[in-house]
From Swiss-Prot:
EC number: 5.4.2.7
Naturally occurring in which organism (per UniProt): Shigella sonnei (strain Ss046)
Annotated pathway: Carbohydrate degradation; 2-deoxy-D-ribose 1-phosphate degradation; D-glyceraldehyde 3-phosphate and acetaldehyde from 2-deoxy-alpha-D-ribose 1-phosphate: step 1/2
Catalytic activity: 2-deoxy-alpha-D-ribose 1-phosphate = 2-deoxy-D-ribose 5-phosphate; alpha-D-ribose 1-phosphate = D-ribose 5-phosphate
One cellular component (GO) term of this entry: cytosol
One Gene Ontology term of the molecular function aspect: magnesium ion binding
Name of the featured protein: Phosphopentomutase
Residue numbers binding Mn(2+) 1: D10, D347, H348
Biological role stated in the UniProt entry: Isomerase that catalyzes the conversion of deoxy-ribose 1-phosphate (dRib-1-P) and ribose 1-phosphate (Rib-1-P) to deoxy-ribose 5-phosphate (dRib-5-P) and ribose 5-phosphate (Rib-5-P), respectively.
Gene from which the chain derives: deoB
Length: 407
């Protein structure tokens, strides 16, 4: 019986890549800088002392970071016994965004350039805005700028509730984001608006990776909160991923936990499970692992590392999340059967000590564990697609066009 369990710690980079200069990210190091802050006592909010990740360390995390940067993260044990196989992987894709990272993990790197809305004010073409107002019968719109998702709620949330005008905003990523109040505007209405935006962006040739519904609740600035009903409308991957091949060629099952299905535009996904927050995502993952049959992938995205702590530049929060993940990791490991493999990885970096609020171009960790997986270094991987090619070989599907199997 063959089963693979893929856990993406969204944004958990382990040091800048060789091409980081192109992105303004030379020196970025999500894990390294979090560990450094913890070791200095600068991340003692909700936790205390050096970063404590014994289980991830046993799977090779500290060694993978050493391979990427040349040093063991501050306060972590570089001499701990390693029971997993580990690597650090470079991104072949042109961007440092979520779809690019995930698609490349599944064997399909993004070798084209996404479209972006680069102007920080008046970010969107008037023609596009006019079509959205007309088609969705809107009273107007707010925002039309680059912004952090939480900041813009404090700035415009009250006006949105009074006027019914949706908040349109973007970032350095290839995204069109729409924030609306779940109750005063309505969740279904927001989703319908996002569908219209997705159509217009696709038909207009803007080449934008994702439209993101950003519902929120609250009644005034300072207490607005985004809810777990986020929905991403992505374009489809440009070629069949290893997920699609498993389904098509082996009649396999691919279970999405969290936002995975959205990222792949539902391509190669046979079951979707929604969950919000680290503990709920863990619980849902464990349930699906227990029920998984032969030729099954359970694929989970732990989005909070990115959305709650990386983008918000919350070092202590990120550390709390990592330590929670580490404490619960043995629950996943204990469920593995003889032929199973567990892969822990990331899709990009988002260094919470870095300037701005955007992602960072970093190596990702690739930590592989299973009863039949030989422990030790798998070295520097030239593309995240090595993960996809490894899965293709493991399940016996046709080869992926990119990547080399790691074992």
């Amino acid at each position: 019986m063959k089963r693979a369990f893929i856990m993406v710690l969204d944004s958990f980079g382990i040091g800048a890549t060789e091409d980081a200069e192109r992105f303004g990210d030379v020196g970025a190091d999500t894990l390294g800088h979090i560990a450094e802050a913890c070791a200095k006592g600068e991340a003692d909010n909700g936790r205390k002392g050096p970063l404590n990740l014994p289980n991830l360390t046993r799977l090779g995390l500290a060694k993978a970071h050493e391979g990427s940067t040349g040093f063991i993260p501050a306060g972590m044990d570089g001499n701990a016994e390693v029971i997993g196989a580990y690597a650090w992987a470079h991104e072949m894709s042109s961007g440092k965004d979520t779809p690019s990272g995930h698609w490349e993990i599944a064997g399909v790197p993004v070798l084209f350039e996404w479209g972006y809305f680069s102007d920080h004010e008046n970010s969107f073409p008037q023609e596009l805005l006019d079509k959205l107002v007309e088609r969705a019968n809107l009273p107007g719109y707010l925002g039309n700028c680059h912004s952090s998702g939480t900041v813009i709620l404090d700035q415009l949330g009250e006006e949105h509730m009074k006027t019914g005008k949706p908040i349109f905003y973007t970032s350095a990523d290839s995204v069109f984001q729409i924030a609306c109040h779940e109750e005063t505007f309505g969740l279904d209405k927001l989703y319908e608006l996002c569908e219209i935006a997705r159509e217009e962006l696709t038909n207009g040739g803007y080449n934008i990776g994702r439209v993101i519904a950003r519902p929120f609740i609250g009644d005034k600035a300072g207490n607005f909160q985004r809810t777990g009903n986020r929905h991403d409308l992505a374009v489809e991957p440009p070629a069949p991923t290893v997920l699609q091949k498993l389904v098509d060629e082996k009649h396999g099952q691919v279970v999405s936990v969290g936002k995975i299905a959205d990222i792949y535009a539902n391509c190669g996904i046979t079951k979707k499970v929604k969950a919000t927050g680290l503990d709920a995502l863990f619980d849902a993952t464990i349930k699906e692992m227990k029920e998984a049959g032969d030729n099954t992938i359970v694929f989970t995205n732990f989005v909070d590392f990115d959305s709650s702590w990386g983008h918000r530049r919350d070092v202590a929060g990120y550390a709390v999340g990592l330590e929670l993940f580490d404490r619960r990791l043995p629950e996943l490991m204990s469920l593995l059967r003889d032929d199973d493999i567990l892969i822990l990885t990331a899709d990009h970096g988002c260094d919470p000590t870095w300037t701005g609020t955007d992602h960072t171009r970093e190596h990702i960790p690739v930590l592989v564990y299973g009863p039949k997986v030989k422990p030790g270094s798998l070295g520097h991987r030239e593309t995240f697609a090595d993960i996809g090619q490894t899965l293709a070989k493991y399940f016996g599907t046709s080869d992926m066009e990119y990547g080399k199997a790691m074992f």
